[in-house]
Structure formats: C-alpha cells, structure tokens
Amino acid sequence: MKRSIHAIASCALVVASAPSWAQTGEKPDLSGNDPHWIEDTVSQCWAANPHPEGNENISWSGACEGGVITGPGTLTWSQNGRISGRDEGTFKDGRLTGKGRISTVDGASFDGEFPGPGVLTLPDGSRIPAQTVRDSTGWTIEAPVPGERTK
C-alpha cells in the first residue's frame, strides 16, 4: 500500500488490492514468498499488497476466510514501525470492495465506492470529485485536474 502524499497530489493513489484469485482461478501464494500479499501476524490473515515496500506491516480487525481478509473491518498499514494509513470498509479476496474509506497519516483520504465515485480530500482540506477504477495492479483513484477542486 502506498501512503505517500505525492501519489495523492498527482490525483492517483494506489490502494491495497491485487487481481482477484476468484477471477483468475488461482489461489494467492500465502506462503510468504509472494511480496504482493502481506500477513497480519497476529490474526494470520493476508491482504493484497500490489506495490510492496520494505518494512511494511498490517493490522486487521475483521474476519478471515481461507486465510484472506474478508468482510467489514479496518486494515491499518505501518511502515518502519509507524502507522502510514488505514483502509476501512468491506473487503473481499483481500481487497477493499464496495463503500469504503482509505486515509493517510498526513490527512489525505478517499471516501467512496470501490469501484466507483467518491471524494478525494487532500491534506490542505481541498476536496476533489474522483472515482476508483481497477487496473492491472489494483485500484487507482482518478480525479480531474486540481483546478476542479471543491472546498
């Protein structure tokens, strides 16, 4: 999960997800060998991590199905021992699905549908109509040019 402001400032934020193994017919490699899956070592639930970085950890407050985060809950991301962001909503196959919210510690957030419309809020409080779309690595938040902000 990328939790950097430069991603939000450019109006594209990558959110935890990966191609659904339900769609591909292949189960995820939950052995720890695939860096695109990350495990909450307390709950022993795995979440999709399409853009892995070093020293990442997650904490999941929800259910597991087949070892993968499922249903309503909060996924908290940390890097180098510091919280970097949260994903809140309903998860399926290890990724946020339906109505949800992602937020970063610097105050940026997206509230909306996965996939679908929502509002991207920048750290300065500016609000931008946006939408989430699936791409080859997960969710991308697309927004119009920053001049179309609402306050």
Regions found by a protein language model. Give the residues of each.
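Bacterial N-terminal signal peptides that target proteins for export
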Residues: 1-9
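Repetitive helical segments and hydrophobic/amphipathic motifs
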Residues: 11-15
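N-terminal signal peptide c-region/cleavage motif recognized by signal peptidases
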Residues: 17-19
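Glycine/tyrosine- and acidic-biased, solvent-exposed loop/turn segments at the edges of beta-strands
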Residues: 21-151
